[in-house]
């Protein structure tokens, strides 16, 4: 399985020029590499831009064979990890610095891993024109490197872009959203730090056919007016199997909302199309410590998959770092929302003074319109490094996705500390999960069974007396429930469910538990996959 991310990139030495050779490239050779590039400044388009026009263009493009993008050449192609890390966009070169405009645009330099340049255009009223970027827009933080770069040399495009806005303070333009690499992007709500990412589309993730990574090949940004609180972004998506037109309406806030409208056109049959895909990292926590000898009790960007199926039905699926590639599927029809949440906001839960995992955003997807029947798929990939994104989640439509199909989806993305749907306001929720060997304390462990301890609190449970008639409803597929005991935790407004299970070696056990009473479910439904490896 190949899962990439713009969040953490582990660099390797370029297989071409050595670093010393690279730094001695002459300004003339750099200029020669860029000379064949067309002058974007001379390409001011006379035609008007609209999302409908983009949709029609991508529909027509799907009728022709896929043409792979040309990689960058010369100097840009030879950038290695060390050099790329020394290149920064100059803040004073940010676009849209006019008085009263609350958004700023920065670009990412092409090269290194980002060898396919992305065209960036600006829409102003009905007119559209390329946004040209040159070497003067970037700072090259090394004397030899800087001297090898000619002034004002025009770029063939960029690796991506980011938008800034006064998100946390009125006098500071903080990062808001980043688009970089394939169709990856990520955003921030107030007081959060970058964590999980999203993608425009997932194609055959974790399947034998091999995963395909569509890319945003061209982007249009509508020039914001003074006082605008929403910025509009449009993107063309292209790959061997599919083309697409995307519209993003980005509204920053305590919870930043990105409203997405997408139209897809299939060139080929696609075995599994992933709509609104999310990518995150889960290394370990108190329930799944694995073999990690780590002073930090928990290391993760997200801890649970949340699926709100109906008014009173919420599934809570704690994430795993499994011993082998694992998948879970959750069927639904027109779900209210789904996403990956970081629920625990206590520093003591993580104890990481640099990464501050307690400030990583949750991301909930709110479908708009009729999504029909389908399922949410959760993919969990074994990982031994927190630099690897090993969690993927997305919606799979029930119907086959075949060549010639045209599909349309709209949804809202909610990025923040506690976005709508991440935590139920009425149902009790899972506040703690621990697991270990079976048996009781003080005697020899029962290695034939596995114990799961799930603590519920909040919602309707807050009003329940200690003698309330609550009942655990528990099931286990491919496993045997040896024991299920529910009790109230003395001195705390929490209810503890203790499960003990037995399963065959190497069995994949799907467990489900919910607390009910008074003819209704009182908590979200805890679901879990235990691999008895």
Language model regions located:
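Primarily extracytoplasmic ectodomains and periplasmic/lumenal surface modules that are beta-strand-rich
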Residues: 82-85, 90-95, 126-130, 256, ...
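A contiguous, surface-exposed recognition patch within enzymatic or periplasmic domains that forms
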Residues: 82, 154, 177-183, 187, ...
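Extended, loop-rich substrate-binding clefts of extracytoplasmic carbohydrate-active enzymes
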Residues: 195-253, 369-384, 388
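Hydrophobic residues positioned within well-ordered beta-strands of beta-sheet architectures
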Residues: 118, 231-233, 244-248, 258-260, ...
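N-terminal secretory signal peptides
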Residues: 1-21, 28-37, 42
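Solvent-exposed N-terminal domain segments of exported/luminal and surface proteins
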Residues: 64-207
